[in-house]
Curated annotation (Swiss-Prot):
Name the UniProt record assigns to this protein: ASTRA-associated protein 1
Record has Nucleus as a keyword: yes
Role of this protein: Component of the ASTRA complex involved in chromatin remodeling.
WD repeats: 11-52, 55-93, 132-176, 313-352, 362-399, 441-476
Gene Ontology BP terms: chromatin organization
InterPro entries (UniProt xref): WD40/YVTN_repeat-like_dom_sf, WD40_repeat_dom_sf, WD40_rpt
SUPFAM superfamilies referenced in this protein's UniProt entry, alphabetically: WD40 repeat-like
Subunit structure: Component of the ASTRA chromatin remodeling machinery complex.
Presence of the UniProt keyword Repeat in the record: yes
Record's keyword terms, sorted: Chromatin regulator, Nucleus, Repeat, WD repeat
Subcellular location field: Nucleus
Cellular-component GO terms for this entry: nucleus
Length: 476
């Protein structure tokens, strides 16, 4: 099996940092972001943008479709933004131009001068912005953020080793409200220290077993400062998330929201609201009236407990996490050569400190990105190499995007002929894309049949992005 290259998308002038398949009404498209804050929403079939805008002034670290057409971005400019992309009808379809590339639109110039003789108003006129809301966040490291069911996990405001949990939306039946009016930012858990949580968990387990021993900082066996900074965070479900750390530890956390709920009434109310997955845009996120029990929420943080720990990747930092929903496992990649598989516990009443797990030596270091579907596992490495495996980890293919270059002559004598050398391009992400459902062709005219035949989104696709600003799409 070898992937078939279908096309290459070119438009970014900077290193691509994130890509995200974007689903609307059962149709798949692609969103990409780069190191200068530019965002492009691509039509995969036409190979052209649906919309282009400058979303941030710095490197975009997280790009995530959270639900119903809303797009979340997180950047090193200390902002998280949520964009209503689907309902944006007046966006630019022009590629970013060099004169606009480095304009700092969202920051205030200290000297009051405009960058590259281009005004911010000119940039906004050329590339209008979708409706959006802004959430300030810690940008001291390169850890991503993740979202599930109105809740957001981010590195803590004051310490990148710790994390915060936010509630960012309050359900409302007023669908005509703006996105900004619906934002209800609330930090429900602040500066959660994993090391203190670990000490508390182990101490409690020791007491239950009759062992009088408490972990102290002076006996810390870790080579780094405790677990180090957060590297990757991943929600598995609404009340369960995993964080990969600089030390190589993978830790699972369970959120118990029941402690923050009190006074449940048996009478159902018809004016309560929950997201409707069948309705797109803001109306789907906030506009579905359903019956539910009236609950009074008291001002109490949810209970977060540590339920899993594994150090199989230590001492290498964890740089990639993905969830395999078919096997209910977390797949973890690090700066080393080993890919590890972690079974998610079936119940969370007991802490699982597991020293062993399934691991595979891929014989190549720097596991930058991992993606999986029902039959294929794809791993991308720092240096641009992509490997494909079946679910039993038998290697199926290798691919490396090469950039031809001419070797430098050793002398000016003219005796040595220049030789062409192959130089690999640094990889950013690999993504396996769930194909569209094949539509029945309602018309038998030639144009409709050709359009249906050329629709590549009905097949299994592999999308790889690179630091030269290109995106390559394969059929797998």
């Amino acid at each position: 099996m070898k992937p078939i290259e279908l096309c290459t998308l070119r438009g970014h002038l900077n290193d691509i940092t994130c890509t995200e398949p974007y689903y609307i009404g059962g149709k798949v498209s692609l969103v990409s972001a780069d190191s200068n804050g530019w965002i492009i929403w691509w039509d995969i079939n036409t190979r052209r943008p649906n919309c282009v805008w400058k979303g941030h002034d710095s490197n975009i670290v997280t790009l995530r479709q959270i639900c119903n057409g809303l797009l979340l971005t997180h950047s090193k400019d200390s902002d998280i933004k949520i964009w209503d992309v689907e309902n944006f009808k007046s966006g630019s379809r022009e590629m970013p131009a060099e004169k606009y590339n480095n304009v700092q639109y969202f920051s205030i110039d200290r000297d009051g001068e405009e960058d590259n003789n281009v005004s911010k108003n000119e940039l906004l006129e050329a590339f209008p912005l979708p409706e959006n809301v802004v959430i300030p966040v810690n940008a001291l490291n390169y850890c991503n953020v993740d979202y599930s069911n109105h809740h957001l996990i981010t590195p803590a405001t004051t310490d990148s080793n710790n994390f915060d949990l936010y509630s960012i939306f309050k359900p409302s039946h007023q669908t005509d409200e703006s996105l900004e009016a619906k934002l209800n930012l609330k930090r429900v858990a602040a500066n959660i220290d994993p090391w203190k949580l670990y000490k508390k968990t182990i101490t409690q387990l020791n007491k239950e077993q009759g062992v009088e021993f408490e972990i102290g900082n002076e006996n810390d066996i870790l080579k780094r400062d405790k677990f180090g900074i957060m590297m990757k965070v991943l929600f598995v479900r609404d009340d369960l998330f995993y964080i990969g750390y600089e030390s190589g530890h993978l830790i699972g956390y369970h959120i118990d929201f029941s402690g923050a709920i009190n006074n449940e009434n048996e009478g159902a109310k018809s004016d309560s609201v929950k997201p409707d997955k069948n309705v797109s845009g803001l109306a789907g996120l906030f506009g579905n009236k359903t019956k539910s029990f009236d609950k009074t929420i008291i001002n109490k943080d949810p209970h977060i407990k540590m339920i899993y720990m594994n150090d199989s990747c230590s001492p290498y930092p964890i740089i990639s996490l993905v969830y395999d929903n078919k096997e209910n496992k977390i797949i973890c990649g690090s700066a080393g050569k080993q890919l590890t598989f972690h079974k998610i516990p079936e119940e969370f009443s007991q802490f699982n400190d597991i020293s062993d797990c399934k691991r595979y030596n891929l014989r190549h270091s720097g596991i930058q990105s991992v993606s999986i579907n029902n039959s294929l596992l794809v791993v991308g490495f720092w240096d641009g190499l992509i490997k494909g495996y079946d679910l039993d980890l038998n290697e199926l293919f290798k691919y490396c995007k090469r950039l031809p270059r001419i070797d430098v002559l050793e002398s000016n004598s003219g005796q040595q002929q220049p030789r062409e050398k192959q130089n690999s391009i640094k990889l950013c992400t690999v993504k396996l894309v769930i194909p569209n459902e094949t539509d029945v062709v309602k018309s038998n005219d030639y144009k409709s049949l050709i359009k249906h035949k050329r629709d590549i989104t009905t097949t299994n696709l592999l999308i790889s992005s690179y630091y030269d600003g290109t995106i390559t799409i394969f059929k797998v």
